[in-house]
């Protein structure tokens, strides 16, 4: 309600995680456990109860960087979840314009456009299945 509707992707009634923010990465390949999820520092104001991380694998793209446009979605992955306090305590802050190394120090040479808090997919919690629609 009000301005709060711009800070969360989902509102779940009667659940311990009421306000949920979904963070999505677009990819050329299906995600691997040692790949990363990200939250931009500029998104910290959202203050959800839970983050859910997803990846969409696309068949092709044109352009590079911020100008990249993706086509032919092939698959959608729910890669995990985490509560904000735990996420920001464990995540690595990647500076704007620098490659974003994983926790092992490897990089995919992607330079961040803004400061990002990154974490490996393998360090996330699995999705709480009680968040999924239940059969009536």
Where are these regions (language model features)?
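Nucleic-acid endonuclease domains
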Residues: 1-18, 23-136
